[in-house]
Swiss-Prot record:
Has a bilobed structure, with a recognition (REC) lobe and nuclease (NUC) lobe. The REC lobe (residues 1-314) is formed by the discontinuous recognition (REC) and wedge (WED) domains, while the NUC lobe (residues 330-594) is formed by the discontinuous RuvC and target nucleic-acid binding (TNB) domains. The crRNA-single-strand target DNA duplex is bound in the central channel between the 2 lobes while the non-target single stranded DNA is bound to pockets in the REC and RuvC domains. This is CRISPR-associated DNA-binding protein Cas12m. Mg(2+) binds at D577. It comes from Thermanaerosceptrum fracticalcis. Binds only 1 Mg(2+) as opposed to 2 usually seen in other Cas12 enzymes; lack of the second Mg(2+) results in loss of target DNA cleavage activity. Residues 330-540 are annotated as: RuvC-I. Keywords: Antiviral defense, DNA-binding, Magnesium, Metal-binding, RNA-binding, Transcription, Transcription regulation, Zinc. GO terms for molecular function: DNA binding; metal ion binding; RNA binding. Residues 154-211 are annotated as: Recognition domain (REC1-C). Residues 576-594 are annotated as: RuvC-II.
Length: 594
């Protein structure tokens, strides 16, 4: 077994174990639990070895796209092996065609009458008849498919063997350093599993000059050895203790500046380093082992940004750090609802009656709206420039290449096409084209300014939101022993309703969902729970909003239109989000935790 294959199988087993842990929640409580610390430091542009970095991330990008191409071919071969015709598949196909036809008919009626209120009694009745039939037939199809799978198991095993052989062959010919090769193969393995579970295909990546190079230490690299600059994978020039402990901020800033060298690749078994100026804004624990180190190249607007990421295993006295004596349980209801002070993302209720909420204030919402405004300004400028150019080009005698480049200008939707036209015109000026050139040059300057503004603002507001979520997660995980969340699939909130269920959601609601980014908050909360050894569990979310927490009466109401609701049975007045959090808390205390 090759080194790459053994490493990949080990990581696959780890992913499987992690998946099982996530399904039932996680609870880090043993004294032997290892503590890991992830640190990130800002870097300036490389002073040496940038060509090695670019070479490795380009090769990683190319290998990924080749793996995706081969995986799609493999998936097609599997489908060919598993294809079979039966009475069940024929009936499923007929019913699905009828269902799609009815839904298209509903859409056309709404479009014709320009309203969501149309008489759809007959179509809805037929759809309700088709749905249970389809469900039953698909269950039967699964049983038939399982028999086919068993019958063709050897063929599928052979295809899987061939796929893995192709992966190894592509890896050998990629020219990647072994750490970077493992990084791509591991990402590929995780990506293909996610695509398979979602019923989709893996996606190709567009080359934009971003990526990372990584080094990994299987037994760990002592921090002192890294600062001694003798290791052939990672070196950081040592800094004085004043970089972190001097009372004068200016001295701390000056002393924390140093250089990092990370091995990007090899030549004749000799290391080729990338060197970058780095700011060690916080101390790296001396009694720690470095497990992985990465230099990441990101793009913000028209420029590239670099950072150094370190993952450390804490040793010595800090291995089992003393945590505060946590007690109590808190339940959190997630969502996105506009309130007076901003956008409410979460409501928390604990077992002592305390409640609080997480709100993205109006300043954050204003910044998100400004991003949208800048996009609108760019689009209007683009459309106005197109209209001017089409009129001006009519007055010029254009060569064939210029005619070809501008023939479909009226249908352009991308600013990139206009930038390519600007570049072409700069290199191929024509007699009497001064007005055309002025229009193009004015547009380019304005476009670059607006684009830089938009992308930098986007970067700032996303980082600001993440910091808000981190602070809130850190605060509650240092207070409670158990955190309870509702169990629901976030991607279901993105799916549009079927036509028979009503018109599609409004744009503001969809935009608020994007601004809230519930998945990001949930990830930050999960990370904080792991770090502080807090139990993190899920309970079913069904009916938590419509069930009164005081009397238990279930009553359907328009949850989107009203935040405050009065129970028709007991007369209790409650906020529906806090009500849901109280129901989650009560359910978890009754042993309903998953």
């Amino acid at each position: 077994m090759s080194r790459l294959e053994a490493r990949t199988r080990y990581l696959q087993a780890g992913q499987k174990r992690l998946g099982k842990i996530r399904k039932r929640g996680f609870f880090m409580e043993t004294a032997a639990t290892k503590n890991y610390l992830a640190l990130s430091f800002g870097c300036l542009s490389p002073t040496r070895g940038e060509e090695y970095l670019l070479d490795q991330i380009k090769k990683k990008h190319d290998l990924w796209n080749k793996l995706v191409e081969k995986d799609r071919e493999h998936r097609e071969k599997v489908r060919q092996v598993m294809v079979f015709e039966s009475e069940t598949t024929k009936k499923i196909k007929e019913l699905e065609e009828e269902l799609n036809s009815l839904r298209e008919e509903i859409k056309n009626q709404r479009k014709t009458k320009r309203t969501g209120k149309v008489d759809l009694t007959d179509q809805k009745a037929r759809i309700e008849e088709i749905k249970p039939q389809l469900k039953q037939l698909k269950e039967k199809f699964k049983e038939e498919r399982s028999f086919i799978f068993e019958a063709r198991k050897q063929e599928l095993a052979q295809l899987e063997k061939e796929r893995w052989a192709v992966v190894k062959e592509l890896g050998k010919g990629s020219g990647l350093y072994w750490c970077n090769l493992e990084d791509v193969v591991n990402s590929y393995d995780i990506g293909r599993k996610k695509a398979k579970a979602a019923g989709g295909e893996m996606r190709f990546h567009r080359w934009d000059g971003t990526g990372k190079v990584t080094v990994r230490f299987q037994k760990g690299l002592p921090v002192n050895e890294m600062f001694s600059c003798t290791n052939n994978l990672l070196q950081i020039d040592p800094v004085d203790k004043d970089a972190w402990y001097n009372p004068v901020r200016a001295i701390r800033r000056k002393k924390s500046r140093t250089r990092v060298r990370l091995r990007a690749c090899s030549e004749n078994k000799k290391p080729l380093f990338i060197e970058l100026p780095v700011v060690l804004h916080r101390e790296i624990p001396e009694d720690a082992l470095i497990r992985t180190a990465s230099v990441i190249r990101e793009k913000v607007g028209m420029r590239y940004r670099y950072k150094l990421n370190l993952v450390l295993e804490i040793l010595g006295e800090n291995t089992n750090r003393i945590l505060p004596a946590l007690e109590g349980t808190a339940a959190i209801d997630l969502g996105w609802r506009t309130v007076k002070d901003g956008l409410r993302v979460a409501c928390l209720v604990d077992d002592k009656g305390h409640s609080e909420e997480l709100i993205l204030d109006n300043d954050v919402l204003h910044e998100f709206n400004k991003i949208k405004d800048l996009q609108s300004i760019r689009d209007n400028l683009f459309n106005e420039t197109k209209a001017k150019l089409m009129e001006l080009l009519k007055t010029l005698e254009l060569p064939d290449e210029a005619k070809e480049r501008t023939s479909h200008m009226a249908n352009w939707r991308s600013q990139q096409k206009m930038l390519r036209l600007h570049q072409y015109w700069r290199e191929n000026r024509l007699p009497g084209d001064d007005e055309v050139w002025e229009v193009l040059e004015y547009w380019r300057k304005r476009e670059i300014h607006l684009y830089e503004w938009q992308e930098n603002l986007r970067d700032q507001v996303l980082r600001r939101r993440k910091e808000i979520y981190r602070i809130f997660a850190a605060k509650i995980t240092r207070k409670y022993k158990t955190i309870v969340l509702e169990e629901f699939t976030l991607n279901k909130t993105v799916q549009k309703p079927n036509p028979e269920e009503g018109p599609a959601g409004t744009l503001p609601a969809n935009r608020n969902r994007f601004i809230a980014a519930i998945s990001e908050f949930r990830n930050e909360l999960a990370n904080a729970c792991r770090k502080n050894h807090v139990e993190f569990t899920y309970v079913p979310a069904e009916n938590t909003t419509i069930t009164c927490h005081k009397c238990g009466h279930k009553e359907k109401f328009d949850a989107a239109a009203q935040i405050i609701h009065t129970c028709s049975t007991c007369g209790e007045l409650w906020d529906q989000d806090y009500n849901a959090a109280k129901n989650l808390l009560a359910f978890s205390q009754k042993g309903g935790v998953k």
